[in-house]
Amino acid sequence: MSSNELFELLYNEINLKNHFWWPNYGTFEVVIGAVLTQNTKWQNVESSLLNLKNKGVLSIEGILSLDDETLANLIKPSGFNNVKTKRLKNLLSAISLEFGDFENFKDSVDKEWLISQKGIGAESCSAILCYACERDEMVVDNYTIKILNFLNYEFESYLEAQEWLCGVDFDMLSKKYDFKSLNELYCAYHGLFVEFGKEHIKGYKFSQYAKNLLENFG
């Protein structure tokens, strides 16, 4: 079994309307969403993002201008709002100091710098690089690991799982599914895992349909 085969299985199961998948791909909003989505559902993140938009503060300067209590209230739907307030403030202060603005951050940030920021783990780092900065970075989330484990793949680290997934044949898949870049492929691949997981995995329980599909595939 190869990463290519798994990609095609998921691609044929999920009707992915947009290869880039993440809402407002390539924008500053993705950075905020990647932090807010830690340990919560995306619909909760959308409520928080809407609060920030309605307040007119969905920017580095806007968020940094807020006191902690105000920001915590605005992002309350995402849960862990006091912790996430500190994480956002720390990250955006560092971005402002090191890069000045989002566009420079998008063009210049590297993985080592980003993952060294407090509260930014491997998954959040990959999500920001892939969906905000448009880099060739594959995101590995819990759904991905659960599916790979079901297929009897065990990985000792995030990087090891990421490397296996990145074994896709871009030339073949780009011709077959019209991917214009490796980033576009990685965006879609992660999106497929998430959408499949949302539909077929509850906790650690797979739907019978998913079990049959993956067992036959494996």
Region annotations inferred by a language model:
Residues S3-G218:
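Catalytic cores of DNA base-excision repair glycosylases
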